[in-house]
């Protein structure tokens, strides 16, 4: 058994897919970026709202809600983009081709 993060992967599976460790590290990095984007985006949006509260006053609960929604949207976008990069990496490690090259027809 090979340890892959918190889970264990059978040796046969790990030997069939030599890029599994790199893919797992990439996905882990993508999720960490997503969480940090959520925290940063929520905090930045909330701080920005506190700065403009004189011109556009509304209740505190709406400020929190708007900040959390903005942080969630930004986090989703960052995680989706980074996960797509990891999927492209996985395809490259498995096939040796980039995903854009897979659809082209090379005739000799």
From Swiss-Prot:
Keywords: Membrane, Transmembrane, Transmembrane helix. Its main location: membrane. It comes from the Eukaryota. One of its GO terms (cellular component) is membrane. Gene3D superfamilies: Tmem141 protein family. It is found in: Membrane. Disulfide bonds: none annotated. It is a multi-pass membrane protein. The chain crosses the membrane at residues 34-52, 62-78. InterPro entries: Tmem141, Tmem141_sf. Signal peptide: none annotated. PANTHER family: TRANSMEMBRANE PROTEIN 141 (PTHR47229:SF1). Belongs to the TMEM141 family. This is Transmembrane protein 141.
